[in-house]
Amino acid sequence: MRRTLYRLMIELTNGRFTSYTLRKFAQSRLSSIIIPSYAKVFQINQDEMEKGLKEYRTLHELFTRKLKEGKRSIDTDASSIVSPVDGVFADHGPIEDTKTFDIKGKRYSIVDMLGNEERAQRYAGGTYMVIYLSPSHYHRIHSPLSGSVTERFVLGRKSYPVNAAGMEYGKEPLSKNYRSVTEVNSDGEHMALVKVGAMFVNSIELLHERDTVQKGEEMAYFTFGSTVVLLFEKDMIEVVQELKSGQELRLGEKIATRLAHK
């Protein structure tokens, strides 16, 4: 019953008009009125911001803010996979040979997430990692490794929330929400970076479309809190053992080791 009611409420409020109205407001000068309250409620670390709080003219500018130079360091070890974002480490685990994985009691299909069987087959037997970004986090997304971009594509339309309620009651939000996917070939091994849109402000902006990416390089940004899913081929990585669900991660922090580079 709760799941049915939750989904009904989302469907009634999560339309194009609502998304458009909220997006236009966030991009308007009028939204600057609530910036101080937003920063206080979500406890934004103003010491790290590139500009002072009063210099952001709209909520959109604050959402997509940059950090001061030197506030994040990228692990330079050739064997490391780094966190592509600031966020909360949600979960990791094996991708079954059936091209599915379980998180928070819900089964997700890699075929659904990536749009077809051929793409999904590449990750059968591999590893997934999920990182959640709250409204307080830095919203720019960086590459977790270096390599050649093999494909960029967008799937989905509407988005369910990716918070705890959305993960429990939503329609498989990680594989059904609006999402932007970048696949990278790194030394012959593949990784998919799935950028999952958030409810209402359903926007993910790519910053470039170059054929290669470098570890730590800026790739895109969310316009509100959301989630990143990383998919790795079989026998490609070993997740850092110390990582725990609920742990805060910072951009550039080592989260896994490349097995071929050990």
From Swiss-Prot:
Q: Which residues form the active site?
A: 86, 142, 226
Kindly state a single biological-process term from the GO annotations of this entry.
Answer: phosphatidylethanolamine biosynthetic process
Keywords from UniProt, A to Z, are:
Cell membrane, Decarboxylase, Lipid biosynthesis, Lipid metabolism, Lyase, Membrane, Phospholipid biosynthesis, Phospholipid metabolism, Pyruvate, Zymogen
Q: Name one GO cellular component term.
A: plasma membrane
Q: Which cysteines are joined by disulfide bonds?
A: none
Enumerate the residues marked as the site Cleavage (non-hydrolytic). Answer: 225-226
Q: Where in the cell is it found?
A: Cell membrane
User: What is stated as this protein's family in its record?
Assistant: Belongs to the phosphatidylserine decarboxylase family. PSD-B subfamily. Prokaryotic type I sub-subfamily.
Summarize the protein's role: Catalyzes the formation of phosphatidylethanolamine (PtdEtn) from phosphatidylserine (PtdSer).
This chain belongs to the protein called Phosphatidylserine decarboxylase proenzyme
Lineage runs: Bacteria, Bacillati, Bacillota, Bacilli, Bacillales
**Gene of this entry:** psd
